[in-house]
């Protein structure tokens, strides 16, 4: 049979195959390989199609969900626009009618929810004097019959305020003392930690204030030699209400008294710049002590006859009492001590300053927070 090899013990004999048989065999192999590749391509295509069948439905669901939400939102906006909004403002009369309707509805609802008895007051258009009389009647205060009141509660508040100021001065001085070298002689102002802290704080304030004045060329650095911020507190009593002179408001008169030993001692040098710069200096040491300050304090809140912002005005009656003493030493070699004229001039200048700033008819104006004032207004 052709195409078969015969194996025997003897030598191997081969038969030659015709060329047509070889060609038919090669074509068979090629057709088998092409069928194999076609089958593999069919399998891959089937898996890819199955994957897309899972992806496409998920994308369609998200798109449909978003479209549904958009439709609901547009429907809600349309209904809101139709029921609660208007396309045009309308005429002025219609706007006013709508405003009155809204205000009436809100006012009616508020009256139904709250149960407040009706209050009546004098309209402001009747004048300030009528309003003041109405004010006194509402607070049940008759100035002609009401007895002076004690101010124990005010004494406690003022004492706490003064104590807070004293503690803040001491804290500021302690903070400044950490950065300064205390290589100074033993002075009365350094007798204890509190005086030392107050000395440092006051020296810093005084010397900084002297920098912007013309006297800085004539005065040397100020050294606080003695200081005592006191240990007592002022007392207020006999508060009474009085009508103001211009009949535009009322004022409160309060008697006060402060007895303590407020002490301040300063040492410096006064320079003479003639005929040359720093030709000579005059040493000066001053110590002032205030022992008693008493009088009548007047407090008035309101507006003046002319249109001004609301403010509080404070002044003293002219019969105030100020008991103070001043000790001085001038000179380095030959010293002038406790010259009476210097004490008289200094205390007279202090009293004159008080009379021209806080003694009636001069007031110390305290601006109060205003409504409707511009930020640029210094009194606002």
Swiss-Prot record:
Q: Which residues lie on this side of the membrane: Cytoplasmic?
A: 86-380
Q: Biological process GO terms, please? A: mitochondrial genome maintenance; mitochondrion-endoplasmic reticulum membrane tethering; phospholipid transport; protein insertion into mitochondrial outer membrane
Question: Which Gene Ontology CC terms are recorded?
Answer: endoplasmic reticulum membrane; ERMES complex
The Swiss-Prot or TrEMBL record annotates one GO molecular function as: lipid binding
Q: For side Lumenal, which residue ranges?
A: 1-64
Protein origin, superkingdom: Eukaryota
Spell out where the chain crosses the membrane. 65-85
Chain ranges of the SMP-LTD domain: 147-369
Alphabetically sorted, this entry's keywords are: Endoplasmic reticulum, Lipid transport, Lipid-binding, Membrane, Transmembrane, Transmembrane helix, Transport
The record describes its membrane topology as: Single-pass type I membrane protein
- What coarse category fits the chief subcellular location reported for this protein? endoplasmic reticulum
Pfam families associated with the record: MMM1
Please tell me whether the keyword Transmembrane helix is annotated for this protein: yes
The record's annotation in InterPro entries points to: Mmm1, MMM1_dom, SMP_LBD
Q: Where in the cell is it found?
A: Endoplasmic reticulum membrane
Keyword Transmembrane helix among UniProt keywords: yes
Subunit details: Homodimer. Component of the ER-mitochondria encounter structure (ERMES) or MDM complex, composed of MMM1, MDM10, MDM12 and MDM34. A MMM1 homodimer associates with one molecule of MDM12 on each side in a pairwise head-to-tail manner, and the SMP-LTD domains of MMM1 and MDM12 generate a continuous hydrophobic tunnel for phospholipid trafficking.
What PANTHER family does this protein map onto? SMP-LTD DOMAIN-CONTAINING PROTEIN, TEX2 PROTEIN-RELATED
Instruction: Copy the domain comment.
Output: The SMP-LTD domain is a barrel-like domain that can bind various types of glycerophospholipids in its interior and mediate their transfer between two adjacent bilayers.
* Function, as annotated: Component of the ERMES/MDM complex, which serves as a molecular tether to connect the endoplasmic reticulum (ER) and mitochondria. Components of this complex are involved in the control of mitochondrial shape and protein biogenesis, and function in nonvesicular lipid trafficking between the ER and mitochondria. The MDM12-MMM1 subcomplex functions in the major beta-barrel assembly pathway that is responsible for biogenesis of all outer membrane beta-barrel proteins, and acts in a late step after the SAM complex.
Q: Which protein family is named in the record?
A: Belongs to the MMM1 family.
- Name by which UniProt lists this protein: Maintenance of mitochondrial morphology protein 1
Q: What is the lineage of its organism?
A: Eukaryota, Fungi, Dikarya, Basidiomycota, Ustilaginomycotina
Gene name, per UniProt, is MMM1
